[in-house]
UniProtKB/Swiss-Prot annotation:
A motif (Cell attachment site) lies at residues 555-557, 1000-1002, 1206-1208. This is Collagen alpha-1(XVI) chain. GO terms for cellular component: collagen trimer; collagen-containing extracellular matrix; extracellular region. Glycans are attached at N47, N327. It comes from Mus musculus. Residues 641-661 are annotated as: Nonhelical region 7 (NC7). Residues 1-21 form the signal peptide. Residues 733-747 are annotated as: Nonhelical region 6 (NC6). It is found in: Secreted, Extracellular space, Extracellular matrix.
Amino acid sequence: MLTSWAPGLWVLGLWATFSHGTNIGERCPTSQQEGLKLEHSSDPSTNVTGFNLIRRLNLMKTSAIKKIRNPKGPLILRLGAAPVTQPTRRVFPRGLPEEFALVLTVLLKKHTFRNTWYLFQVTDANGYPQISLEVNSQERSLELRAQGQDGDFVSCIFPVPQLFDLRWHKLMLSVAGRVASVHVDCVSASSQPLGPRQSIRPGGHVFLGLDAEQGKPVSFDLQQAHIYCDPELVLEEGCCEILPGGCPPETSKSRRDTQSNELIEINPQTEGKVYTRCFCLEEPQNSKVDAQLMGRNIQKAERGTKVHQGTGVNECPPCAHSARESNVTLGPSGLKGGKGERGLTGPSGPKGEKGARGNDCVRVSPDAPLQCVEGPKGEKGESGDLGPPGLPGPTGQKGQKGEKGDGGLKGLPGKPGRDGRPGEICVIGPKGQKGDPGFVGPEGLAGEPGPPGLPGPPGIGLPGTPGDPGGPPGPKGEKGSSGIPGKEGPGGKPGKPGVPGTKGEKGDPCEVCPTLPEGSQNFVGLPGKPGPKGEPGDPAPAWEGLGTVGLKGDRGDPGIQGMKGEKGEPCSSCSSGVGAQHLGPSPGHGLPGLPGTSGIPGPRGLKGEKGSFGDTGPAGVPGSPGPVGPAGIKGAKGEPCEPCTALSELQDGDMRVVHLPGPAGEKGEPGSPGFGLPGKQGKAGERGLKGQKGDAGNPGDPGTPGITGQPGISGEPGIRGPAGPKGEKGDGCTACPSLQGALTDVSGLPGKPGPKGEPGPEGVGHPGKPGQPGLPGVQGPPGPKGTQGEPGPPGTGAEGPQGEPGTQGLPGTQGLPGPRGPPGSAGEKGAQGSPGPKGAIGPMGPPGAGVSGPPGQKGSRGEKGEPGECSCPSRGEPIFSGMPGAPGLWMGSSSQPGPQGPPGVPGPPGPPGMPGLQGVPGHNGLPGQPGLTAELGSLPIEKHLLKSICGDCAQGQTAHPAFLLEKGEKGDQGIPGVPGFDNCARCFIERERPRAEEARGDNSEGEPGCSGSPGLPGPPGMPGQRGEEGPPGMRGSPGPPGPIGLQGERGLTGLTGDKGEPGPPGQPGYPGAMGPPGLPGIKGERGYTGPSGEKGESGPPGSEGLPGPQGPAGPRGERGPQGSSGEKGDQGFQGQPGFPGPPGPPGFPGKAGAPGPPGPQAEKGSEGIRGPSGLPGSPGPPGPPGIQGPAGLDGLDGKDGKPGLRGDPGPAGPPGLMGPPGFKGKTGHPGLPGPKGDCGKPGPPGSSGRPGAEGEPGAMGPQGRPGPPGHLGPPGQPGPPGLSTVGLKGDRGVPGERGLAGLPGQPGTPGHPGPPGEPGSDGAAGKEGPPGKQGLYGPPGPKGDPGPAGQKGQAGEKGRSGMPGGPGKSGSMGPIGPPGPAGERGHPGSPGPAGNPGLPGLPGSMGDMVNYDDIKRFIRQEIIKLFDERMAYYTSRMQFPMEVAAAPGRPGPPGKDGAPGRPGAPGSPGLPGQIGREGRQGLPGMRGLPGTKGEKGDIGVGIAGENGLPGPPGPQGPPGYGKMGATGPMGQQGIPGIPGPPGPMGQPGKAGHCNPSDCFGAMPMEQQYPPMKSMKGPFG
């Protein structure tokens, strides 16, 4: 069995049929085989294939179908009397083709207009429809529905109101490719797209005229029913048989003859005829079909107008598959067509292969700088190391909200998003407006590639700052989500012609082609699936006669900006001069690259994030000290960067390639709190916006007690306590009026209340459980305000929404300075200050006094200092303060600061510090010990490492240090050495410390910390011993200038300078926090139908449905087993007095009296006159059982018997009516997750999240500025005299070693004031000033633009169960549910009426004694059962909440009456419940009816006695064993019996109150007494 046909093969076969007249396989029989006559075909050579449904469905041979003669055409078949169906294998032995045309000539009947029915349907082997054509009489439309490839249904709807005018119509449905079209009376009604569908399998049945709901045949008349295997044959069909006058002989009967061969007229309109596009099939070159296709096209061309003479409006050229096969000359290109309507969205193409690596940086010419392209965005990096901690600067006040910025220009289209999940099954929306009809042709030839457009106009935005050169591209980021399609933009200018490409591969078939008005020759099809990427093309041949390329179409509007990608891995910048050999053993740390050239000014950006802080406002009132937050979680170390790739050269010219870094990744994980130096005092910010609503204040003073409310309704009774002490004997109860005779020991109705008794002793039971809360009383007036209460514990609820802005408050008083707060976040960089006033020129200081001693010997190496705080800021960069750490994970119950925590993890090194001041020369130490032999080779590597990590620390070329084994002679002056270990190497150690700590574990001993900063000069050493007098030295050269004096004390803080001019624009800030979610986007276009989801888990039980319809009576159940006696229940509550019941049944017969003594035997007297009937004699002894007598006649209906014993569960009855709503059940267990629902509407914007933690440290900064010059060396020794009087100018000498300090000179005169100095660098941060006063609240700013849509938040925790909702209005009647499970066996029916009196039986044997205890127990149980039912009835009338909240509060005020709820939607039928467990044994039933009469006994031996007087009735016999008879009809009301004599005196009653359960059964349920004022019922 062929399950699917390739559309290409199918079309191929069709063309083969048309060209050669061959049969299309064996799937479609020929018209000769089927008896099909295409009388109106204009092409006799066309071979018609298809199926004659009238023949294949045996309609002519079915006797139930009425045949009516038709003088104008074929017989009329009146369907509807019998189902029209046949197995699919008989109708379509090899299945139905993918493309076909269904032709039906029908007349619909009026009584079918109320139904929805299938005109044509093919089902599968399981009875599910594979394809169906449904008539929707309500909407006057046809719906074609077929099974899609993913198992769901694909469908399209055609409005056809003309079918319902009670006249004959020819209906033609053609399915070709992805398009379905409907023609009514040879006029196109509509064409609709049809999704991909499965092929029709021959496993099921074919139906004509089937009711969709009841499955019955539908009545309509039929003349013609057949299927063509070529969907185009509907154009060859004529409609003469349904036209009133038929067709004139000279008129063409085919619509195709009236049109061009390739143009299809769809519908006459006011502006003229509308034609669809010409279609040509494209097949592979040199295939066998080309000749056939060309042959057929040439035949058609011969039948139409010659096309080589130019094409008119009604003509189309034949399809030229290549220039070699056709000599067609095309005319000049037409005018530019108007903007076409937007086509239907094509299905998404297959995912393209990964593209080749793109070029990175290109050198256009040898002298030009590198032009670099931004690399792809990297993935999100891991958390960076902890940033350098800094002390917080004083926080300025919040600035005023800036003015709303101008709206940015529309952004460029976003990157394509990831493929969405398959959509859920969508319900077909409301019927759309009638679209323009049109057939879809085969796919057109691939167009020539258009010329590239000119570059667009430059953007309007300000020029961006020059970008830093980037590193290698990061790994490919995840695919962003799809942006919303933007509107179409204006068309670009025509571009210069590009290199033409070769012909691309064949594309997929096109979708529905919208029809265009006449004269529009620039036809454009709907977009198909994106084809695979074509190979680079060769130059296209310039054939003569081809038209010029049309103008480029309008450009669409850009889409909404795409989602931000994840953060890439950090990479160092690469410069063009860095090779791989410079990176050393530490991969991934590149040196800073050269600054890139300024980019072309970009377009104006979207609205920016929050602006920088304004000028600092006046200091605010000090806030209360906040608790010190716990240290944040240490972030994971980021992965090292890949080494910079070597520069690659391209072959096409002198181009060099350098990677630039990708865009910045997202903000990393928060770092720990920093501990850096305090920042400078920021300027006061502008007045801030009104803050969010503050936390709730402390509770107020408790109010005075309010007025006592009205008493609430009494609660439900508590659990019964233990029995109290026995009371005194009460008065006897009166007998219940409804019980007579032997039942007098049952308690009677309650009497009037007696006098109030003395209070009894206190009970000894436990207190009962609290009763249900009473209904709230009437709300009392509010009490006076109470006194100030104690502050409550901190709340634990979620943060509430921001309240409305309050009115502006008065400024508060100056508070006391608070304690130092936790480190604050770094403030924004302030504006450039204006230069301060020029200071006065100070006097020249006097030279220092003192005699310079001889140089001391070098001292020994001091002990290693304590590890100081590492701070390695990059030279020339400010020291940044760290952001405060993220809030701790746990909130304590107290808001007091906790104890001192353990020391935090050492922070990462900061950037290199600023150069220190010139230190004071130290004293020479003692001579050192000879050094050990150094390992050559390690130091250069270490130096290289340090250089790569810390920057160029040496400020010049470094010399390898000399490795001394023993003291040698003094060498020449060396080049300045590498800076000490304490600045650069400690940075390296600090960076490597976390790895070492991870490898070492938590409990191992820590490594020594970084070396501290240079210490202050130590105290002067003790004077050394006087040395031997040396020889007098030569007069030395003048000494160098003395050392710089010690740093003076810090001066007083200067006056605040004037406000400076605005500084240059700062660098772009970090990305701001994510804005609130945006407004809901524009509703997207409908997606393709997604695959059906897997069957979901069973959902939670649905709410109780509405009452169903009355079900039929169930069959009579079998008799159930006798239940055991239940235990005696607790004493019930005092009930209301019941109504007097109806008269009770006659009492049981009295006990048989003792037989009297036998009298003397009398002689037989003469037969006297028949006397009157004597009194009944005493009962004789029971006789032996008699022989089974014949069955008596059916007796009259007896009276209702007593209830029988509980029978066995009967078979399941039909579903009964739905009962009233039951009590609210307890909250069920959480259900299993249901299937994914439809996408909901976007929710409201969420509340602002907590501030994010500090970001990870940035990449290494650029190389710092050169350091200050070194110290002057000592003067060298004089050289020998020169050869001549004047020597040549020598090279500049190497600076000599530093000389000893010269003798102090005489104090000089004060010098002239020097020129004013350059403005000094920023001084150290000043002390924290006192906080300013609280500023006034500013007015609320204007409403900001809606932010972009926020990311989807994580699923919240499961909320607590809500309060039960009020009952909704009753919904409409739901559909009838499936048959329920078997019900329990019904109770036995009521006994039938009493039969006719039978023949008197023989006296029975002595019966058992009547057990009155059983009778009393039974009556008591019945009464208790009635009481329970009455209690349940009253309880259901009370509107108490069935569940009490877990933490009950005080009763609230009474709520207002709620408005009646809207009717709820009808619930879906519930699933059949599980079969219940076997019930407990029921109560014993009432005594059974007397058994049937026994068989007649054998005739006894003895002398026949005389006829005695009729004996009294015998005692009750044992129960019989006959089967229960059928329920008899209701008997008539019997005559009231004679009142019996009063019974004997009953036994004394039990002590205590009357048990209401003994009397309650007499109260009818339907009536109610008004409550007595002196009594209270169960609910007061």
